[in-house]
Every structure is written in structure tokens, then in C-alpha cells.
UniProtKB/Swiss-Prot annotation:
Subunit description: Associates primarily with CDK7 and MAT1 to form the CAK complex. CAK can further associate with the core-TFIIH to form the TFIIH basal transcription factor.
Stored CDD domains: CYCLIN_CCNH_rpt1, CYCLIN_CCNH_rpt2
Keywords: Cell cycle, Cyclin, Nucleus, Phosphoprotein, Transcription, Transcription regulation
Cited SUPFAM superfamilies: Cyclin-like
Family according to the record: Belongs to the cyclin family. Cyclin C subfamily.
Protein name: Cyclin-H
Localization: Nucleus
PTM-bearing positions, type Phosphothreonine: T315
Residue(s) carrying Phosphoserine: S5, S132, S304
InterPro entries xref list: Cyclin-like_dom (IPR013763), Cyclin-like_sf (IPR036915), Cyclin/Ssn8 (IPR043198), Cyclin_C_2 (IPR031658), Cyclin_N (IPR006671), CyclinH/Ccl1 (IPR027081)
Amino acid sequence: MYHNSSQKRHWTFASEEQLARLRADANRKFKCKAVANGKVLPNDPLFLEPHEEMTLCKYYEKRLLEFCSVFKPAMPRSVVGTACMYFKRFYLNNSVMEYHPRIIMLTCAFLACKVDEFNVSSPQFVGNLRESPLGQEKALEQILEYELLLIQQLNFHLIVHNPYRPFEGFLIDIKTRYPMLENPEILRKTADDFLSRIALTDAYLLYTPSQIALTAILSSASRAGITMESYLSESLMLKENRTCLSQLLDIMKSMRNLVKKYEPPRSEEVAILKQKLERCHSSDLALNMVTKKRKGYEDDDYVSKKPKQEEEEWTDDDLVDAL
């Protein structure tokens, strides 16, 4: 399972600082490519800085979760979690200046539906966009064009271990082996809220699914005034391993701090950065050096020859019916 997975080996990182370095490196590499192309200067004011890219990623990740939350038919939580993880992984090594997060977020959701075997047709999927039939068709063409790129950038590691299954497992375990808590279901709603909030942070890239699930349950218990330390020491048999117990408590504290310090992007800042992003993707700046590179394919047969203006007619406002 998780401990033998590609997620543990390749997509679980040691620290927030390591994630920041990866994102800064992706930003730097794109700037170098754009400058080498001869179209822009090294200090061009339209370049986005790493912290600006992060703000845009936060915004589009939130849009991704909103899109999934109102999706029809209802999207399983595992699919939502997988889509969210794909998005996080993609922008660890790629810049929003090269690949627009609007289409990447939809491609992540589309691919997650396939991988998690959520049976929804392509027309059904784009039917959730607030667009004309022609606009939905264009959006689907873009999604299909970017799908292989996304798979490649994920290094073909498509199986995602979400915290939802261990979360249910812990609740069952508490019901059967922890009689001190009569009705563990009272923890569910607040724990679900915690899982929704932590999904917006980098926790999925730093901690194991079971650690996230357990933190959600114990945080919910704490908010309800219920002490569950004895569950860790007795039921999970950590009483004799004080070092392991101490490490687990430190991890849970770090996760709670991640949630506390998360700041949603301010709408005013996002509006400015979105304008900057659109200029990065405009044909006159030519930061997307080669059309087929922008599409992510090396074979000309895969590349859509549609002009840029037609391709980008749909906008963020077209993402969902009910936002």
C-alpha cells in the first residue's frame, strides 16, 4: 500500500523548504528558457515571482475544489483528493507562466475521474462548464491535448493514496477498540472540515495519509473537549515507544500549524496576478516558446493547430454552473 507506493518514494518530501526550492527552481528554469528564446529580457516586469506563482496556484486549487464540489454527478471524495494531488505535483516542477492553471486544473480532474474509475463521459465532464456547446467542445479539446503532458509530468505515478480510507478505518477502530468514546461519529463533521482545510495546504506532500487522517480525528476530539491521548498510547500501542509517540505528536502539531497559518489569496491580489498571467500567455510576449511545447507533446500529430485567440475564449468564469 502506501509504504511501498510511488507516492512515498517520489512525492512525499522532507520539508516545506524543499517544496519551496522545487517551485523556485521551476520558476527560474522557465525564465531562463524565455530569455534564451530572445523575446524577453531577464528582468522583464511581466515575469511572475515564485510567491506570485504560489498565490495563483492557491487560487486555482481552490477553484478546482469548488468545481469538484458542485460537479454532477456527485464526485467521490477520493477523486477530488486525487485531482488535488495531481495539481500540487504538477506545479512543483512546472511554472504557471508556461502551462495555464485554468486548463491544468480541469485536466487534473478529468484524469482523476479515469484513474479512480469514476464513470463519467467526456461530454458529461465538460457539461459542468458554464459554456456553450461549442465552448465545451473547445475546452474538451484542450483537456485531451494536455492529458498526456500531465501524465508525463507526474512521471506516470497516477495512483494517489488519500486520507479518506484510513480516516474511515480509524473511526471503525475507535468504535471497536476504544470504549471510552461512546459515539465516535460525533467527530466526523469537524474532522471532515479539517480534511477539507488541510487539502488546501502542502500537507499531502509532506505527511502520510494515515497521519493526516489521525490528526483530523484528534483535532476534532480536541475541539469537542474530548481527550484521546489514551487511544494513541493504549489502542495504538505507543505507550512503550515514547519516541514514536513524541514524533507522532510533533507531526500532528505541525499539521495543525499548517492549517492555522494558511492564508487564502486575497481577491485584489489575485485579480492583478491573473492579468499578469494572461499577458505571460499572450502571443505578443511569446513566453510559450513553441506551440507543441506548450501543448506538451513532441509529435506534431498530437498538436492542435487552432490559433491561440480561439483557444482561450473561455475563461475562469466558465468553470462551473453554481459558483
